[in-house]
C-alpha cells in the first residue's frame, strides 16, 4: 500500500556509496518520497562510505542536534609516505618520504590515540573561524590559526603492510579521522593521508542495519519497510511470508 507523503517519517539508515556526496543522497530521497523536511546526523566526505542516518519529517529532524553529538566508529586506511593538502585522497600531493616505519614504531604511535587527545581541525574542513568556513580560506591559499579541540578516541590497529596502515577508531563528535591519519604520518616521520574511510556505526545505528544508498535512485523504491524510530526499532515491520 502506498503511503501518503505527509505520513512518511522516521529514521532511514543508508550505506553511502563511494563517490556520492551526502547531500546528493538527501536530494535523491526528496525526489523519491516527496518529503522536503529531511535532515541527517552527520555527513561523510565523497570518498567515504558507510552509515548515514537520514531523518525524515519534522518530528525526526528535530533530533539532528542530539544525534550529531553521539559517538561514531570508523574503519580507515592511512597511506604512509605521502602527504596531501587536504589530509585525504582527494587532495593535492605536497610531500613524499622514503622512510618505511617499523611495526614497533607503528605500535608506539597508534597507542597515543587512546582517551582524550588534542586535535586541530584541518584547513580543508567546514569548521567556521570568524564566520567563514576553513576550506574557504584554504582555497584562497590562506592558513588560519585554529584552536585545539579536545576529542575522545579509541584507536585499534588492524593491519600494517607498508604503505597501508589499517585501523578502527571509536570517537566523539568533532573528531577528524583525516587529522588522525595526518598526525600518525607526522609522528612516524614519513607523512600520511587518509586513503579509505568507512563509517561502521553512528550512535546506536550500525552498518548492518543500512540499505544500499543506490536504492534511493530507483524510481518507486519503497522506503517504508526500512523506517525506524529514534531507538532503532522498525516502524512498519515487513510482513512475514
UniProtKB/Swiss-Prot annotation:
Disulfide pattern: none
Pfam families the record matches: TruB_C_2 (PF16198), TruB_N (PF01509)
Single GO molecular function: tRNA pseudouridine(55) synthase activity
Active-site residue list: 45 (nucleophile)
Gene3D superfamilies: Pseudouridine synthase
Top-rank lineage group of the source organism: Bacteria
Coiled-coil stretches: none
Its EC number(s): 5.4.99.25
Catalytic activity entry: uridine(55) in tRNA = pseudouridine(55) in tRNA
Function recorded in the entry: Responsible for synthesis of pseudouridine from uracil-55 in the psi GC loop of transfer RNAs.
Entry similarity comment: Belongs to the pseudouridine synthase TruB family. Type 1 subfamily.
This protein's name: tRNA pseudouridine synthase B
Native species: Chlamydia trachomatis serovar D (strain ATCC VR-885 / DSM 19411 / UW-3/Cx)
Protein's gene: truB
